[in-house]
Structure formats: structure tokens, C-alpha cells
Amino acid sequence: MRTSYLLLFTLCLLMSEMASGDNFLTGLGHRSDHYNCVRSGGQCLYSACPIYTKIQGTCYHGKAKCCK
């Protein structure tokens, strides 16, 4: 009986994830913009980019700039 409740709970969690457009199944293989910025040698800043750097992209879903 306990395992059936556990399976039902797991199924409900999966269905709730699928209801929202951004779930773990669509996110497989995709890296966050923050990860890509830092990996390419940049840094994420909410303010303007420092002197002698330029904007290479965005971070935190477009809320910050990736400066490199």
C-alpha cells in the first residue's frame, strides 16, 4: 500500500513538472547562461561592464550582462 502511494506521488510530481513549460526533461543538455559566461572567461554583472571589457551576452535569464 505504501509503494502505491509513493508511485502515485512520483507520478503527480512528474505531471506537475510537465505542466510547466520549463521542466527537467526539456532542460537536459542545456547549460545556464551564467555557466556559459563564466566558462568562456567572462563575469556576470548587474551594473555596466568595466573599462576595456565589452558585453558578450546575458546572465541570469537576461537580467545581467556577461562582460569579457
From Swiss-Prot:
The keyword Disulfide bond applies. One of its GO terms (biological process) is positive regulation of flagellated sperm motility involved in capacitation. Disulfide bonds join C37-C66, C44-C59, C49-C67. Residues 22-32 form a propeptide. One of its GO terms (cellular component) is sperm midpiece. It is found in: Secreted; Membrane. GO terms for molecular function: CCR6 chemokine receptor binding; identical protein binding. Its main location: secreted. Keywords: Antibiotic, Antimicrobial, Defensin, Disulfide bond, Membrane, Secreted, Signal. Pfam families: Defensin_beta (PF00711). Residues 1-21 form the signal peptide. It comes from the Eukaryota. Belongs to the beta-defensin family. Monomer. Homodimer. Has bactericidal activity. May act as a ligand for C-C chemokine receptor CCR6. Positively regulates the sperm motility and bactericidal activity in a CCR6-dependent manner. Binds to CCR6 and triggers Ca2+ mobilization in the sperm which is important for its motility. This is Beta-defensin 1.
